[in-house]
């Protein structure tokens, strides 16, 4: 278990007296906590690596007891690093990985199993069975007819709906079908279900609070973003009792206080938010048409669609960004896997020592000498949607060296960004206002500049790239009046660099055309 704590030089005695907010991000690979002052400066930080468990092929779990200890530890360490007292914390905001869930005993609080990660594939056969079923075909055809006559977006969404293993829905159905302890607890109405946010809230309040927020609920596959409630249709289809599911609250909301036995003082828990939505908020993408490009383990492209959920054919799905009082903000999101994963894989092959080296390695060449990389260790997502695609290098020659391989990997990330952006433009008919990037890979200026060139848009990179922490803290700060409104947050956000298009699309056209050929040859490689 690795950990780190840092404290910037700017911690000042006057700001210490003013109070602070905490932003915690529980990600798939790391759990981070930052302490923010009123100027939104990071005064202290702590991070630990989240360890995934692989009990069987395709199964991905997280030990809840270990995660809990890490959560408590990063808060204590970040407060210590900031040189402040816990009683100076005026609010806690929690951002979490999405669609990772657990069930537990309502009376004792004891969990029935480990967290089932959003990456877990145990429900693959259930997904195939449901998506290929006569019932799903009937639902799709009926909703297509209803959409034709009514033009209702809700019927369009239903006509395109398919289950995936990333949804909670069928992984939860698998648990209900296969774990007798859970079945018994459900029958006795003694079972609670929760994503990471709900479980942490339950633990922090010693069992007194049971809730989630709209952003987390909307990513489960069990929530109807049009009706803004748990879907009675989906839960009924899968025999999931509504009584299992937590009440859905505003994103910036008083969820209760941390039991004072944990940190010595009762810290207010005033924001629960899903990680991509938190990053969107942290980037101050508050207006319709604002776009966020997160490049981390995978790439997520989100556009603010106002208060209207937007469904597309090519792979953009509707989510609730956040709900604060009467304000409901919807997003359309799509993703590409294996962004940071590809870079980490190359590092494991000793193509470089530090990921920071890759920028100069790529820039030292005119081109990749006809070498192309397909980043599909976990298949290809939108707009190609092929889970059977394989990762590959193509165009290798005796003269190919590690510099060509690294450049090809970085180019593939930019090419996938271009594909996602084009799909968004074709299917989400909302003019783009601005684009902001975050995530670890956005530190790579080669990828950033090439993406800017390919999409012919200006892209803003912030000073601090941990936008999920920032968004959680911002939502918490608004809830307690630490910051007055979103206009104040906009003024506090700091831009590190703005990338403007330097090359025309024509200069990339042949290269991207060849890369697309490589992608097509990698598709349908695996049988299942």
Swiss-Prot record:
GO process terms (BP): glycerol catabolic process; glycerol metabolic process; glycerol-3-phosphate biosynthetic process; triglyceride metabolic process
Q: What is its EC number?
A: 2.7.1.30
Q: Is-annotated flag, keyword Oxidoreductase?
A: no
Biological pathway: Polyol metabolism; glycerol degradation via glycerol kinase pathway; sn-glycerol 3-phosphate from glycerol: step 1/1
Q: What class of enzyme is it?
A: transferase
UniProt record similarity statement = Belongs to the FGGY kinase family.
According to UniProt, the name of this protein is Glycerol kinase 5
Q: What lineage is this protein's organism placed in?
A: Eukaryota, Metazoa, Chordata, Craniata, Vertebrata
């Amino acid at each position: 278990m690795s950990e780190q704590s840092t404290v910037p030089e700017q911690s000042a005695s006057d700001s210490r007296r003013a109070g602070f907010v905490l932003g915690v991000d529980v990600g798939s690979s790391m759990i981070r906590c930052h302490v923010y002052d009123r100027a939104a400066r990071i005064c202290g930080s702590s991070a630990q690596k989240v360890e995934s468990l692989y009990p069987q092929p395709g199964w991905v779990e997280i030990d809840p007891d270990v995660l809990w200890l890490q959560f408590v530890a990063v808060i204590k360490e970040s407060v210590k690093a900031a040189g402040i007292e816990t009683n100076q914390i005026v609010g806690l905001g929690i951002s979490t990985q999405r669609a990772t869930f657990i069930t537990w005993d309502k009376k004792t609080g004891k969990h029935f199993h480990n967290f089932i990660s959003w990456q877990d594939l145990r429900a693959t056969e259930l997904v195939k069975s449901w998506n290929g079923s006569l019932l799903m075909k009937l639902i799709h055809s009926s909703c297509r007819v209803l959409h034709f006559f009514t033009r209702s977006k809700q019927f369009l969404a239903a006509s395109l709906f398919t289950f995936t293993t990333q949804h909670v829905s069928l992984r939860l159905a698998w648990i209900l079908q296969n774990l007798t302890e859970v079945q018994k607890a459900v029958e006795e109405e003694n079972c609670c279900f929760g994503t990471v946010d709900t479980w942490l809230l339950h633990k922090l309040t010693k069992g007194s609070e049971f809730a989630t927020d709209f952003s987390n609920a909307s990513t489960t596959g069990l929530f109807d973003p049009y009706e803004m409630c748990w879907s009675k249709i989906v839960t009924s289809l899968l025999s999931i009792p509504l009584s299992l599911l937590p009440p859905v609250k505003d994103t910036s909301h008083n969820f209760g206080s941390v039991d004072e036995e944990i940190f010595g003082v009762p810290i207010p828990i005033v924001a629960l938010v899903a990680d991509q939505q938190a990053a969107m908020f942290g980037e101050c993408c508050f207006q319709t048409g604002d776009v966020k490009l997160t490049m981390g383990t995978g790439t997520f492209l989100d556009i603010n669609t106002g208060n209207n959920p937007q469904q597309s054919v090519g792979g953009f799905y509707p989510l609730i960004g956040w709900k604060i009082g009467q304000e409901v903000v919807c997003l359309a999101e799509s993703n590409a896997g294996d962004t940071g994963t590809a870079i980490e894989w190359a590092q494991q092959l000793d193509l470089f020592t530090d990921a920071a080296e890759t920028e100069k390695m790529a820039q030292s060449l005119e081109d990749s000498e006809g070498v192309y990389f397909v980043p599909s260790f976990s298949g290809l997502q939108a707009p190609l949607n092929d889970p059977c695609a394989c990762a590959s290098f193509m165009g290798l020659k005796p003269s190919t060296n590690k510099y060509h391989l690294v450049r090809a990997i970085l180019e593939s990330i930019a090419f996938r960004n271009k594909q996602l952006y084009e799909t968004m433009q074709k299917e989400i008919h909302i003019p783009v206002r601005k684009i902001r990037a975050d995530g670890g890979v956005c530190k790579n200026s080669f990828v950033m500049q090439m993406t800017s060139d390919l999409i012919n848009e200006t892209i803003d990179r912030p000073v601090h790239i941990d936008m999920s922490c920032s968004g959680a803290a911002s939502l918490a700060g608004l809830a307690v009046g630490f910051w007055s409104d979103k206009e104040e947050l906009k003024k506090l956000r700091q831009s590190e660099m703005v990338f403007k298009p330097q090359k025309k699309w024509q200069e990339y056209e042949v290269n991207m055309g060849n890369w697309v050929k490589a992608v097509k040859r990698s598709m349908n490689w695996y049988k299942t």
